[in-house]
Every structure is written in C-alpha cells, then in structure tokens.
Swiss-Prot record:
Similarity remark: Belongs to the NhaA Na(+)/H(+) (TC 2.A.33) antiporter family.
Gene3D superfamilies attached to this UniProt entry: Na+/H+ antiporter like domain
The gene coding this protein: nhaA
Subcellular location: Cell inner membrane
GO BP, one annotated term: regulation of pH
Organism classification: Bacteria, Pseudomonadati, Pseudomonadota, Gammaproteobacteria, Alteromonadales
HAMAP family: NhaA
Protein name in the entry: Na(+)/H(+) antiporter NhaA
Sorted UniProt keywords: Antiport, Cell inner membrane, Cell membrane, Ion transport, Membrane, Sodium, Sodium transport, Transmembrane, Transmembrane helix, Transport
Membrane topology recorded in Swiss-Prot or TrEMBL: Multi-pass membrane protein
UniProt GO molecular function: sodium:proton antiporter activity
Catalytic activity: Na(+)(in) + 2 H(+)(out) = Na(+)(out) + 2 H(+)(in)
Domain of life: Bacteria
Amino acid sequence: MERAIRNFLSQESAGGILLMVSVVLAMILANSPLSGMYHGFLETEMQVRVGNLDIDKTLIHWINDGLMAIFFMLIGLEVKRELLEGALSSRAQASLPTFAAIGGMVFPAAVYLIFNYSDPITQVGWAIPAATDIAFALGIMALLGSRVPVALKVFLLALAIIDDLGVVVIIALFYSTDLSTISLIIAAAAILGLIGLNRKGVTSLAPYGVVGLILWIAVLKSGVHATLAGVIIAFCIPLRAKDGSSPSESLEHSLHPWSTFIILPIFAFANAGVDLSGMSLSSLLSPVPLGIALGLLVGKPLGIMLFSYIAVKLKLAVLPEGMGWRHITPVAVMCGIGFTMSMFISSLAFVGEGQMYGDYARLGILLGSIASATIGYFWLSKVLPEKGAKA
C-alpha cells in the first residue's frame, strides 16, 4: 500500500510541474501576437458523424467534455479504491480529511458569495473556489522532497480526493441544464448495463468500454455534464476479480500517465490563456476575481482548519500520527491551489450571458492559486525539519 501511494505521489508531483509549464505557455501565447492563432485553434470545429448520430463541437469543448471525462473516470477509480481499501476505508482514517474537505468547500463558496451576492449572473460561480487541484498541490509539496512525511502527503491526497468527489456532486446538481428526457433514458439504460456487468462478475474491460461510450454520448446529449459519465463507469468496474487481481487498479495505473502527462496539461493549456491586455487594478478588484482569489487563499484554509479543529475537539477525528496543527495549517493553505479543477467549473458556470466573466474568473483562479502555492510552500518548508534532521 505504501509503495502504491509513493508511486502515485511521484507521478502526480511530476504532473504538477508539467501543468505549471502548460499554464505559463498558455498565458504567454494569449498575451502575444500569436493570441489570435491560439484562440482560433481552440475554436476549431470538429465533427463526428456515425449514421444519425452527430456530435459537432469546438476543440476546446472536445477537451472539456471528452478528455476530461477520462480524467474524471480516473478520479472515480481513485475514490472507489480509497473508499474500499485505502485511506478512506475506515472511519478513523476518513474522518479528518472528510471534515476538512467539507469545510474547504463551504467556506470558499461563502467568501465568493459575500462579494457576488447582489449579482445573479456572477452568483453561479460560487463553486469555482471550492475545488482543489491535486496534481498542482502535490507538485508543490514534492519540491520539499523527503522532508515531507508520507502521513502528511496521504492527508492531502485523501482531502483532495474527497474534494474532487464533492465537485462531481456539485456539477451534477448545479451545472446541468436543458435536460433531454430521451437521452437520460438511454443513459439510465447504459448505467443499468454497467451495473449488470459488475453483478455478473465481468472483469474484462472491453464491455465496460463499449457500454461506457454509449453512456458518455447519452450524457453528452442529455444536458448533464458528460464528465459525470466517467465517474459512473469507474464506480461500476470491479475492484477485485475472483483470482485476486484488480481490473479497477489495472485501469487506474494505465490511465495515470495519460491523465497526468497528456490530458491535464492539454486542459490547462486550453483553459489558462487569460488575455491580460484589457485588465487593470480595478479589474482585479472586481467581485468575480476578488471573490475567487480570496475564496481560495483565505476561505479554503480557514474552512479546512475550522472544521478539522472542531472535529478533533469533539473527538470525531484524530490528527495523523506525528502530525500537529503546525503541519496541517500550511497544507490547508496549499489546498487553495484550484487551477485546473477551478477552471473546469468556471467553464461550466460562465456560459451564455455570463461568458464575459470567464477571463475575470480565470484571473482570480490564477492569482489565488499562485498565492496559495507560494505561501503554502514557504510555510510548510519552515515548519518541517531540515533534511536529515529529526522532527
């Protein structure tokens, strides 16, 4: 188990660094003479037609609806494994990160709404600062190397996974519109098919892939966000086969490098290109970017720490062995790194009439995430023992 966690962390950490490069490259292109080419490329129309089925979307929508469905399937596989056999499989292990994650979603949303309560158009962005980018957070933590105890990394990992699960629920409940009854019926039939495969003990991944593709298309056409199909597919794939092997973990290991080194960097490159040419200090201090930035930088750690403290004081949870509040606090600050997850929610929240707020939202995400990463890194570096020293 410990070796699996270390492998996961090392891969996610490298991915976090690659994500940073993707964000910087997107920002450079979006604010250079090549900005027209950059945005034009992302708006390229791509059509898939099979018989009467016709899916016509821009490249950026294929990335957000298609590639990110694979990423969310990976999240689903991780959540299922952790719930059944991992860091969330017992109440004692799951309690603290669960309370922390709840606080870390409630408080950022509240901070955002404080700044945007009077505007119904911008109110829909309340969930943007509620997300944590696990790859970025682990990438920043990895810069401290072996000084970071595994227990602290596992706490961050568990918290971020629960946070991701919360984001999935938020997307399903609040960012699905114009529902198609026929597509929902087809999606329900596909889900029943996946459950049937699981119940019959089918361990081959091919049938899940075929039915899963049908589910993704149905969900895409239904008005519910297509990424949720990935989570449903993941939950239906068996964790253990009769011979002791794990189809779920096998798929998880196969998807990790694709997600870490291809899907998330592409998503970041496509969504992080904020045009700063028309921005000013007043733009930065407008309700949307200010609410998001402070939600990530202030609301996130405040919610995590307050809910964690209350849970420990009420004996509903315990701190990880060898860890104190001085260790948990900078990790809570690091959880304010929203980046790709926050940008994803932003792409769902600000559409149609609110599309003009997209760049403002991304600016707030970048500022809040960078500040959280910087402060969290130096704070954690200060409280951890020097390499070779004892804690």
